[in-house]
Curated annotation (Swiss-Prot):
One of its GO terms (biological process) is translation. One of the primary rRNA binding proteins, this protein initially binds near the 5'-end of the 23S rRNA. It is important during the early stages of 50S assembly. It makes multiple contacts with different domains of the 23S rRNA in the assembled 50S subunit and ribosome. The gene is rplD. Belongs to the universal ribosomal protein uL4 family. SUPFAM superfamilies: Ribosomal protein L4. It comes from Chlorobium luteolum (strain DSM 273 / BCRC 81028 / 2530) (Pelodictyon luteolum). InterPro entries: Ribosomal_uL4, Ribosomal_uL4-like, Ribosomal_uL4_dom_sf. Disulfide bonds: none annotated. Keywords: Ribonucleoprotein, Ribosomal protein, RNA-binding, rRNA-binding. The keyword RNA-binding applies. This is Large ribosomal subunit protein uL4. Part of the 50S ribosomal subunit. Residues 69-80 have a biased composition (Polar residues). Coiled coil: none annotated.
Length: 208
């Protein structure tokens, strides 16, 4: 597959980049994608949820009323799970949600995600650019020129660039990261993947 390289003004530069078939033209493995995305979302969970049992709730040491003669059901504590303010039966307890996915499956999932985007025509290549100062306007103008200003965009750079990263972080629909760090979830959670030209080489090195 070949794609034309665009400049930040949205015009063609005359240069054409060939995308590797094993990354952008592979058969999409939905199962690998499912495994990887499921593990990514699960690993984001803190797992610190906790509710108190009747033994942990403060108070309740005194019997609320006498055993007999009131007409009420017998109660030994105001912190019984049956009463307001009481403990919780079988409530949530802290535990980890981590799920391990083999490296080969992760690689297959990323290749499948990029291939799916390529099949949908949602991959763009822009020439490498640099910003002199941290400013949102140049990045916003570039997205507008490329027709991406109203869409959720994943922009991949070859290396971490603090100026570009900070210039784009005020744009809610834009997610900027290095090509090697883009996960399957990041790719699929965007409408279009926007590559800086040299970021393609970094991605090829990462995926082998």
């Amino acid at each position: 597959m070949e794609l034309k390289v665009l400049n930040t003004a949205g015009a063609e530069t005359g240069e054409v980049v060939t995308l590797r078939d094993d990354i952008f033209g592979a058969e999409v493995s939905e199962h690998a994608i499912w495994l990887d995305v499921k593990s990514i979302l699960a690993n984001k969970r803190q797992g610190t949820h906790k509710s108190k049992t009747r033994a942990e709730v403060r108070g309740g040491g005194r019997k609320p009323y006498r055993q007999k003669g009131t007409g009420n059901a017998r109660q030994g504590s105001t912190r019984s799970p049956l009463m307001i303010g009481g403990g919780t039966i079988f409530g949530p307890t802290p535990h980890g949600y981590d799920q391990k996915v083999n490296r080969k499956v992760k690689q297959l999932a990323r290749r499948s995600a990029f291939s799916a985007k390529a099949q949908e025509g949602r991959i763009l290549i822009v020439e490498d650019f640099a910003l002199a100062e941290i400013k949102t306007k140049p990045v916003a103008d570039m997205l507008r020129n490329l027709g991406l200003d109203a869409k959720k965009i994943l922009m991949l750079t070859p290396d971490y660039n603090m100026v570009i990263a900070r210039s784009g972080r005020n744009i809610e629909a834009l997610n900027i990261m290095t090509a090697e760090k883009a996960s399957t979830y990041d790719i699929l959670n965007s409408h279009t993947v926007l590559f800086q030209k040299t970021a393609l080489k970094k991605l090829e090195e990462t995926l082998g």
